[in-house]
């Protein structure tokens, strides 16, 4: 398994790993590679390119992307909440509430974008 960024899994520069455990059960869920300084530099370079690309999108296009993100959160609430539940050791209803809240925050930014353009 590699470090996931820019839409791809990339082999890490180093060989160190971290175990992801469920704090409620102690179960090891997965071992993930740790990024090293070289990985961090590559990730920052990709992030700068992504920012330039995102900045070139129109406000309505950005709003559409955020709305799609919110819809994907809502469509996949069960899977996302279960993953968060196992990763954080929280109860499932709390995790569902957090995913739902995240979708609502994204929708809120879409509504704010409409006001920036004078549309309501």
Where are each of the predicted segments found?
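N-terminal Rossmann-like NAD(P)+-binding subdomain of aldehyde/semialdehyde dehydrogenases
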Residues: 1-120
């Amino acid at each position: 398994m590699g470090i996931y960024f820019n839409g791809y899994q990339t082999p890490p520069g180093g060989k160190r790993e971290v175990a992801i455990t469920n704090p409620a059960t102690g179960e090891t869920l997965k071992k993930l590679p740790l990024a090293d300084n070289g990985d961090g530099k590559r990730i920052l370079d990709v992030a700068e390119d992504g920012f330039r690309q995102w900045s070139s999108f129109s406000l309505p296009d950005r709003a559409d992307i955020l709305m799609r993100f919110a819809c994907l959160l809502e469509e996949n609430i069960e899977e996302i909440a279960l993953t968060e539940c196992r990763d954080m050791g929280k109860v499932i209803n709390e995790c569902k509430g957090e995913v739902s809240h995240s979708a609502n925050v994204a929708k809120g930014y879409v509504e704010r974008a409409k006001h920036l353009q004078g549309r309501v």
